[in-house]
Swiss-Prot record:
One of its GO terms (cellular component) is tRNA methyltransferase complex. Gene3D superfamilies: Vaccinia Virus protein VP39. The lineage of its organism: Bacteria, Bacillati, Actinomycetota, Actinomycetes, Mycobacteriales. SUPFAM superfamilies: S-adenosyl-L-methionine-dependent methyltransferases. Pathway: tRNA modification; N(7)-methylguanine-tRNA biosynthesis. One of its GO terms (molecular function) is tRNA (guanine(46)-N7)-methyltransferase activity. It comes from Nocardia farcinica (strain IFM 10152). Its EC number is 2.1.1.33. This is tRNA (guanine-N(7)-)-methyltransferase. S-adenosyl-L-methionine binds at residues 91, 116, 143, 166.
Amino acid sequence: MDGVNDAANHTVESVPGRPSTASAPLEAGRRSPTGSRLYPRVTSFRSRRGALTPNQQGAWDRMWPRIGREVGDEPLDADAWFGRQAPLVIEIGCGTGTATAAMAAAEPHVNLIGIEVYQPGLAQLVQRIERDGIDNIRLLRGDAVDVLEHMIAAESLTGVRVFFPDPWPKARHHKRRLLQPATVALIAGRLRPGGVLHVATDHAGYAEHIAAVGAAEPLLVGLNEATGGDDERARTLAPIGLDRPVTKFEDKAHRAGSAITEFVWGKIE
């Protein structure tokens, strides 16, 4: 793959998990020979622990060796992993996989990789994949920024989905938000021309932040209404489906009176 950091033209502090140059003069993303980090990482996700149920563990043991991997530094050969050439989509923070499974089942011609750090959530998705016989999902456990930097080649993705990322509402935590300028630039560099970045949030403050960051990225153009385009035109131009199932989380947000803001940007061709 190409040189692994499309964020090189941005300050490293704007990428979640990357310290400022003042606190860490080492090259962003540099690791020790053993693969461990040479500095503490500020991540965009919260640490959570949880044990798998016996049924989840059984499904995990049967399925994970084939459909799952830990995030690493080696470039990913998605065609070999899926056993076919097909449009490649990644979903960052797939959680328990309700939307992941539904959208993959609706698009059997698409190869979909879900990325998540929380094993019990992944285990629920693994169970669903096994139960429903879904064959076009693969899973990566770990940090999505590492995936984008080290495992995904430039201009290889047809789509990137980020549904309801943690808004980190407190001002002092805004640096932890996933969708920062450098991260969006990294995503844009991994999208093929015509590929789409599809984002949804129920947090008004984060929506304003996301809108500004997306509008400032020169490789992206707004397709739907929230990004200055037209919803119907977005559906026509997008190379992947934009319809999401309403998850329990989203339904709870609706009942709490939170508005859902959806963004669709396309990579310039």
